[in-house]
Amino acid sequence: MKKKIIIFLLALSPILSFSQEKELFDLIISDENATPELLPERMVFTQRIFWGEKGLLRKTGIAPLNLKNREKELKLRRSFLKTHQILGYATLGTMIAQGIIGGKLYNGDNSLYKTHKTMGKVVNAGYFTGAALSLFSPPPLTNKKTKGFSSIKAHKFLASIHFSAMVLTNVVADDNKKAHKAAAYTAFASYATAVIVFKF
């Protein structure tokens, strides 16, 4: 009886082996046919407008959504964000200079008015160029929600504060000196903190 069971199992083993190989082969085929996720589920609205599946760059054919283009986009993203970081440090320096000039202007040194206006344009150019590089960079490959505190979450939260403060600083520049000063200090404090938080 035992011999019959052993012979039966030996006879059955090639069939079982073939069946397992077929299942494995089917899995490989289905994996090869699967479309890899090229875009993250979560994207900033500005990224979705340009780089999303139905974004402007996809619809116009400038950047069709495929693996080769996504590799190029990720390299472009890296250079955008590196430039964003460098501009961030430079802009922080110009903000400090603008704060010193602005302080002297508020203390009655009216000879610095034109310098203050010019420096304001320099700060704005650096700030809004840096912001655009971040907001319009191609999206990452994945963008999962993480629990708890992280430096990137703090950086993004502070960005919403300093962006609003920068816009307000420009809106009230000529009409309300007190509001202009308060908005400028808020922009500087939140911006400097965002730079420090992201560094550490």
How would you name each of these model-derived features?
Residues 2-4, 72, 110-117, 181:
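Intrinsic low-complexity, intrinsically disordered segments enriched in polar/basic residues
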Residues 77-106, 115-138, 153-174, 180-200:
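Hydrophobic alpha-helical membrane-anchor/signal-helix detector
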Residues 146-154:
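Juxtamembrane helix-capping/reentrant segments at transmembrane boundaries
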Residues 1-2, 46, 153:
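Intrinsically disordered, low-complexity sequence elements enriched in Ser/Thr/Gly/Pro
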Residues 16-114, 131-146:
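N-terminal targeting leaders of membrane proteins
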Residues 1-21:
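Bacterial Sec-dependent N-terminal signal peptides
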